[in-house]
Amino acid sequence: MLSPQRVAAAASRGADDAMESSKPGPVQVVLVQKDQHSFELDEKALASILLQDHIRDLDVVVVSVAGAFRKGKSFILDFMLRYLYSQKESGHSNWLGDPEEPLTGFSWRGGSDPETTGIQIWSEVFTVEKPGGKKVAVVLMDTQGAFDSQSTVKDCATIFALSTMTSSVQIYNLSQNIQEDDLQQLQLFTEYGRLAMDEIFQKPFQTLMFLVRDWSFPYEYSYGLQGGMAFLDKRLQVKEHQHEEIQNVRNHIHSCFSDVTCFLLPHPGLQVATSPDFDGKLKDIAGEFKEQLQALIPYVLNPSKLMEKEINGSKVTCRGLLEYFKAYIKIYQGEDLPHPKSMLQATAEANNLAAAASAKDIYYNNMEEVCGGEKPYLSPDILEEKHCEFKQLALDHFKKTKKMGGKDFSFRYQQELEEEIKELYENFCKHNGSKNVFSTFRTPAVLFTGIVALYIASGLTGFIGLEVVAQLFNCMVGLLLIALLTWGYIRYSGQYRELGGAIDFGAAYVLEQASSHIGNSTQATVRDAVVGRPSMDKKAQ
């Protein structure tokens, strides 16, 4: 397996080759370590493209194509390249070119395995003059195909979010229709991007275009932009009778993008879909597909349609785009953002959390019946016995509840449940102990006993002439009396609880030492009595 450094070096060499050679090409700028599911920005490659002298300070237009793998994203981008090169060289209206000319540019091929990994951009940045005379830099971006066999949900979300955050036009490439799961994935990915842009107060992203490929219902909605917009309006319509989840998805999309459009493309033809030798020649592509291409590409890239990249209302230059790439990739390399989860994992977590909460309620309610607020003091042994009984009852309930994810997945939640039950039991023990009358009056009893004992000791020592010792005992009596009055005030007012805790701790320590001493003395007396009995019996004989 190549190390990230070697992969980065290889990509940098590829970028250098593309820049040094007369022929432009795709350059990998975001590298994906699929085994480690990590990302790395090739700053050198990206800088070599965006910091060229003639474009570095121009406002940038970034057109990105994203979507599921093997759905023809790179194929569409190559037609965009044809259009831009045609406009650059001659501005000829027949930008599609020679019917016999193979399609070149971003790497693409037929088949079922993904061709692009990470994010690539075209090494040549196109300078286009808008109708007002302003020059802008146009960058084309290609992304890793989402949901291939090696990509996690986080991988897909990160790539989609990065491309959306750095593009002014995000083309969401879909096959045949806009399904509900497509919208849910879009919601997840854009929210993952919005999390990283926490300082954005406006709509965080600019233009989103749903590009629906292989559209099979032109009799309902015609090919192209007009039919696409009518179809999109219906698909994204929010109705009162819709489920809240469905409404939230649609509201989220509208809240994220300043402009949302849709374009319906027909199938490119049987030769394109099935022939392993197809190389992109126009003669092999269906006529109606080429007709719609001639409407789609100029709609996106016509100088009057170009939209500069903006972040928080400010236009971004090529130099600024490099800095944003560097900032965003650091966010996704860190651990500050939550990891997006699959629908199965999220549902399994919800199932287990609900089962654990229900089991916890069973334990809590049963313990409340035994030693709740209004219940009398309970022996600690009986309380522990009830705890074990109700804990097992709660665990049995958790295990019997049907949950998704399997036993291994649920075991972690069972352990968390046991920890929570342990904490509840400790709280019940403390609450039960506070009901013990002796426990309640333990501190004042110890203090009062100490006052009486020291007062008697003071009188006796004074009677036999030990005035210094008597005065010392009197001082101690005064201190204990102050402690007793202070403890009473704290219990009454609820203030200075730390001081009250210190007095309680001191009283408990004195009581423990006294009890231990009395216990040891009693054991010694009993032992002496047992040992001394045989000798007395012998003397009697």
From Swiss-Prot:
Its main location: endoplasmic reticulum. The modification N6-acetyllysine is found at residue 391. It catalyses: GTP + H2O = GDP + phosphate + H(+). GDP binds at residues 70-75, 109, 213-214, 272, 275. The chain crosses the membrane at residues 446-466, 468-488. PROSITE patterns: G_GB1_RHD3 (PS51715). GO terms for cellular component: endoplasmic reticulum; endoplasmic reticulum membrane; endoplasmic reticulum tubular network; endoplasmic reticulum tubular network membrane; membrane. Residues 57-305 form the GB1/RHD3-type G domain. Signal peptide: none annotated. Residues 1-25 are annotated as: N-terminal hypervariable region (HVR). Expressed in the central nervous system and in dorsal root ganglia neurons. Expressed in peripheral tissues (at protein level). The GB1/RHD3-type G domain mediates GTP-binding and hydrolysis as well as homodimerization. The two three-helix bundle (3HB) regions in the homodimer are loosely associated initially, but they tighten upon GTP hydrolysis, facilitating the fusion of membranes. This is Atlastin-3. It comes from Homo sapiens (Human). The gene is ATL3.
